[in-house]
A protein has these predicted regions:
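Juxtamembrane intracellular "pre-TM" segments in multi-pass secondary transporters
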Residues: 1-5, 183-217, 394-413
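C-terminal transmembrane bundle of multi-pass solute transporters/carriers
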Residues: 52-56, 71-77, 239-414, 426-434
């Protein structure tokens, strides 16, 4: 699987920069302006474009005749915006800073779902690809653990400005690594009469394909709760007598999620839809327990357990998108799905701000209820209507890959996509092809 290691390094570096922006923006705004609210406005401008830019970015990626230039260019644009924020925030007029934040945030979908859409071209179908998505999911969780810690450490020993420069350097590394990935020649374009990705094709696929509709609606609902978890953790730790314990709780959750993605997320024998339901339901149960624990230590244990349960959810989501996204809308499905989750998390953060006066244990129970409701929603949507018919060729390819994996061989058959390409190989494909 040539290129997968470089892809994972690029994804980790890009997501490190993305995950660190929330804390870096707030710390830098507080340091230079004395107002955390100013940082919140800038962060909102950074996050808001994700869902709006997602279909545009996905369609542009699908139509690009030079995929290397497109992916490297979007990562470079993201990095440039981060670097500009390091120098402009708190110094330049607010409209200028907000404009830079909007431009940088518009590149965000390619850092998340856009990069994940490349895995299908790097790894042939079968257990190897499922495991690759597990590793890809671990880059999100690894970045979520390390980036805020690194930003806090640099800011504590220096200032928030160098911390944001560190994030820009990580983004530059991601762009450089992405430039070294093998990309397939996209070919002369679709044949006459063949489907072409329009701006609404990703949204149409998310609605029409039952499996995609189920996982997208459920994870979007679940992420309303996840977005509220950080503020709620701070409030909960304060009521338990540890005002600084919110960071401990969220670190426990992030470490648990990383552990879950590296262990439970690599289970390929369980259908991804079932794995997603189990993950959301178990996360809800663990958070319910966290609402009633009497100390920060026990609460951290419950948060870690919730993180372990949440870890496989992203892996399962990526597998479902890869297997059921129509070929012509694959990148849009990945970018739009990621954008919806970011928007849902932002909504959750805003809602918990409005409800901050409520007892924290009530807020934790509400977040847990959203996870359980998401699991029920997935069950209801997945059970509604006939299942999408699987393409015989794709099923046969996956069966051959599983047999070879059982025999200890990872070689690909003559019909498998190229494992050395970061984009899917050209040629006719059925909509169900992963």
């Amino acid at each position: 699987m040539p290129g997968l290691g470089r892809y994972l390094a690029a994804a980790l570096a890009a997501r490190f920069a993305s995950e660190g922006m929330g804390m870096a923006v707030v710390l830098l705004a507080l340091e230079r302006t004395g107002s955390a609210a100013h940082g919140a406005f800038v962060l909102t401008a950074w996050l808001a474009p994700h869902v709006l830019a997602a279909p545009l970015a996905g369609a542009a990626a699908a139509r690009s005749r030079r995929p290397r230039l497109f992916h490297v260019g979007t990562l470079a644009g993201f990095t440039t915006a981060v670097a500009a924020m390091a120098f402009l925030l708190g110094r330049a007029p607010t409209p200028v800073v907000l404009a830079v934040a909007v431009l940088g945030g518009s590149c965000g979908p390619m850092v998340t779902g856009g990069l994940s859409s490349l895995v299908a071209g790097l790894v042939p179908p079968g257990p190897a690809r499922d495991r690759a998505y597990g590793w890809d999911a671990s880059t999100y969780n690894g970045a979520a653990v390390t980036a805020p810690a690194a930003v806090s450490l640099v800011a504590a020993f220096g200032s928030a400005g160098p911390a944001m420069v560190l994030l820009a350097a990580s983004g530059a590394l991601a762009a450089a690594l992405a430039a070294t990935l093998p990309y397939a020649n996209p070919g002369p374009g679709p044949a006459p009469g063949a489907p072409r990705a329009g701006l609404g094709s990703g949204l149409a696929a998310l609605w029409r394909v039952r499996e995609l509709r189920a996982v997208t609606s459920a994870t979007t609902l679940a992420f309303v709760g996840i977005g509220a978890l950080t503020t709620t953790a701070v409030l909960l730790a304060t009521t338990l007598g540890s005002p600084g314990g919110g960071g401990v709780l969220m670190t426990a959750f992030a470490l648990g999620a990383l552990t879950g993605s590296l262990t439970l997320g690599r289970i390929t024998s369980v259908p991804p839809g079932r794995l997603a339901r189990w993950a959301m339901a178990a996360t809800g149960v663990a958070l319910t327990a966290a609402a009633f624990t009497p100390s920060v230590t026990l609460t951290a244990v419950a948060f870690a357990a919730a993180g372990v349960c949440d870890g496989p959810l992203l892996t399962a989501t990526l597998r479902i998108r890869s297997e059921f996204a129509p070929e012509e809308a694959r990148t849009q499905v990945f970018t739009l799905g990621a954008g919806l989750k970011v928007t849902a998390a932002s909504t959750g953060a805003a809602l918990v701000g409005l409800a901050a006066a409520a007892p924290p244990w009530i807020l934790v129970l509400a977040i847990a209820a959203l996870q359980l409701a998401a699991a029920l929603l997935h069950t209801a949507v997945a059970a509604h209507g006939p299942a999408r018919a699987a393409d015989p060729g794709r099923v046969a390819a996956r069966a051959r890959a599983r047999r070879r994996a059982a025999d200890g061989s990872l070689t690909t058959g003559p019909r498998a996509p190229s494992a050395g390409s970061a984009t899917t190989a050209p040629g006719p494909r059925t909509p169900e092809a992963p």
